[in-house]
């Protein structure tokens, strides 16, 4: 009897270890990451990155566990180590924990734009065209390319909590403010909030923030076997055209 119990105990430990090894922890930014990560109160997950992660682990032995946090809180959790074998998205341009261990292939190219009210249109070529105006940014996100212009007084910095607040500021202060953000997020959230696209002037901001690629980002000590699996599946999604299909659903 003792031998049987001992055997069952070893089997349970082995199964538990397997279950833990098969678990992948996916980190989601609450509210501010649409269309890359879309969620409702930490549930009903979708979006470009989320759908890519779901497609990678579909019909596999891996279980994806979702963890949703406000952006700064998520970064703090990941910098402290987070759960084992975590996945989110990142870029070499972002630094910190979202740049330390990235997928072999990029998933999307980010373009930044300058959004202003169409009631007072102006042509933007460089930051001198923004002299005396205020640039609206989302709380929590850093923009190193803009810091020198805030520091020397070329423009003023204004922070808001979400996209709705950003667009409201533009509509209330035409000609005095402009919102800087990723083009994909700008367009998605205008549609999501059911605002008239004609109310806004959208211009390229690549002269200040050049276009760059984003990738899946992994925990620095991710299991090499799992990371290899993700890279292989991501390459398959790209070569089959499924990656482009996912992106087209949202942009």
Where are these regions (language model features)?
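Ligand-binding cleft/hinge of the Venus flytrap
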Residues: 53-61, 105, 129, 139-163, ...
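Sec/Tat signal peptide C-region and signal peptidase I cleavage site
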Residues: 15-23
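Acidic, polar ligand-binding/catalytic clefts
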Residues: 66-129, 140-143, 204-208
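Extended ligand-binding regions for polar small-molecule ligands
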Residues: 50-60, 133, 215-246
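Bacterial N-terminal signal peptides that target proteins for export
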Residues: 1-8
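Periplasmic-binding protein-like
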Residues: 30-32, 109-112, 195-231, 251
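Short helices/loops that flank or line small-molecule/ion binding pockets
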Residues: 72-84, 101-102, 163-187
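Extracytoplasmic small-molecule ligand-binding "clamshell" domains
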Residues: 22-98, 159-160, 240
